Amino acid sequence: MSAITVVGSAFAQDAEPAASPNDRLTVLERIVIGAGTEKVAIDTPQAVSVIEQEDIDREQATMVGEVLREMPGVNTSGSDRMFGQTFNIRGIGAPEAANEEGRIIVNVDGAIKYYEQYRVGGFFSDPELYKRVDVLRGPASSTLYGSGALGGVINFTTKDARDFLEEGESGMLKLKGSYNSNRNGYLGSAILAQRFGDVADLLISGNYRESDPYVTGDGTEIQSSGFETWSGLAKLTLYDGNEGELKLSYQHWDSDAEDQDFAQTGGSLDSGSVNGFGTVDRHVVDRTAVVSYENPFSGNDWLDLKLQASFSDTTVDQTNASGIPGLLTCEGTFLAPYALFCDSEYGYQTWQLKAENTIESRGSNWENFLTLGWQFAHQTRTGEVTEAAGTTTALPYHPEGTDIKNAFYLQDEIIFNERLTIIPGVRWEWHELDPGSSTGVSQGSEDFALSPKIAVHYRINDTLALFGSYAHTERFPTLDEVYSTGGSNTVFLPSFGLKKEQSDNVEAGFALSFYDLLETGDSLQIKTTGFHNSIRDLIDANPATPGGSPFGPPTIYPLPGYINIDNAEIYGVEVEMAYDAEFWFLNAGYSHLVGRNTDTNDYLTTVAPDELALTVGGKLPEQGIKFGWKGRFVSSPQDDCRDSKTAVVCAGDSSQGSTRYAEAFNIHDVFLSWKPMDGQFRDWELHAGVDNIFDTQYKEFLHNEASRGRTFKISLSNKIGW
């Protein structure tokens, strides 16, 4: 549920979002478009962060997760490898657990993106495709986006033609090249935008990116971390002559890489190291197609319509796996775990339909925005393996099937005297699982989930606002959890009768806004959010079905492979600060999270350490120059046992330990941007920077291995308009 927000700036509660009284806007004054009616981030009754095109360009990110790393409470999990990254919000999200992907909802232009596979990440894309990322932290977003969003929601927005076409231009070509020194990373990008009068515009973009394996601060090369990818976006927007917009878009990402580490993500070190699984050739293709129509019908309080149909398809083909020569290979005697190292194909295909309308009403001292919506999603999971003898068979640890969800939701935003905002909401969602014929099981599963919320925001004056909220959501068991019948050389029963995971989240906080504080025209915003998330009936692997010996017949258990085993709590505080003046700016984000298994009192290994992110920069407006320093100050893990340079065995680990260990570290970066607004270089843009200036050796707590050492970055682009 969303938090109750405190806002310091003038909280205009009209159909128009609140705005700064100054021309300059801080990152906390950016418009939030995914939490209901549009409003600025600091006025939103939920913890929300927004990344825009300027931030993406300045970061010169290689992978999408890099643009999120300064957000409080938001991390990437898995690794810095192209095939090994997924997301973590407030301690929720870990790619080595099949159920973690469903606890965070990820959308691209509204299309659902979901992928889960053993030892592989969950999101495959390129930051060059996007102009904006909205991260809504906490389960409040379940009302609008789907039950079970225990961690939150991440919305990616792709670029549009009108982002590049200036007034009077009918067409534009933008070429961009980038280089980074760790190691020999290259990007080539081209964007073509064309306007067809007042009727339509078209954008076509293509990107090619490659890199050798990167090195860490101490000079260690991370094996098979190199990559070669290409991606593209085509988007046609049609205008009906009034306010209606029909968009048709197609996005494609492709990477065909040889000799990649089989284990792209971490977890239990069952083989002594994550590289103990050997290498494999992987071809990953991700496709997204969206058709949407939006019309605000200005002047008609009964209509503000949004319609969408989308298709998402992610496939992974694995061939030529080395396994562990002489021990575990495709030629092994038993299906599991030897099938891991046979040629195999995995995939998820998701069709979605969504309709949403907002009804406005108002009186002398109140306004009301009632949003009603319907969402339907049909997801198909595929997986098959070709054994050494050439026989094609199903995968017991990656069962095929269909997952169908049908939901209705409403959210009402009631505003009194432009000061008090109350936002109740509820979602009713029906769920059906059906096993594929290859599973040998016929029993389906049906259930119903309820996701209610209530949020309150009160603006005391132009400086101070208070907010608070309560949200409940429920996560359905996944196909993997219900129909898996095999693991690490084990055979077990399907897990019928699993209960839904349930989350109850409470948030409260305040926001401060100041203007003309140190000089005329400056602004300062501070937003602080405290939260407590209580999670019940967590689904996990049945401890009574441990992995068997890989060198003998599989161990057979007459027990379900998954059960509701744990209860947990995650609580903490997040602080965001943004200051902007004519010649300098400052942004800060701090997060302190604690997560425990309330049954055993053990620390949760998915909760990242405390972190402070700072950015201090200068501006030369007439020259179009921005420059500055960024620092990340990350503490040691909450569990002292995991404060280590190497793997250790702590509570809840296998006998070999896990990749969940790290030490405290500080990382320093510098950046420079040049975007002249006039003169002979008007259409040129330069970005340069140095990441990890001091070549520090460090490891992110939620990653497999150490991160990148010192990296010099530069990109140059030029736009040609006509």
Predicted regions mapped to residue ranges:
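Gram-negative outer-membrane beta-barrel transporters
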Residues: 15, 417, 422, 520-535, ...
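Extracytoplasmic beta-strand/coil segments of soluble accessory domains associated
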Residues: 65, 69-111
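Short acidic/polar hinge/loop motifs at secondary-structure boundaries
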Residues: 111-139
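Membrane-embedded beta-barrel scaffold of Gram-negative outer-membrane proteins
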Residues: 173, 177, 204, 302-322, ...
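Transmembrane beta-barrel wall of Gram-negative outer-membrane proteins
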Residues: 179-210, 219-260, 283-296, 364, ...
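Flexible loop and strand-edge segments within Gram-negative outer membrane beta-barrel domains
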Residues: 223-225, 243-302, 314-324, 332-333, ...
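Structural signature of Gram-negative outer-membrane beta-barrels, strongest in the C-terminal barrel
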Residues: 241, 367-369, 375, 399-533
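C-terminal beta-signal and adjacent terminal beta-strands/loops
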Residues: 474-475, 534-537, 541, 621, ...
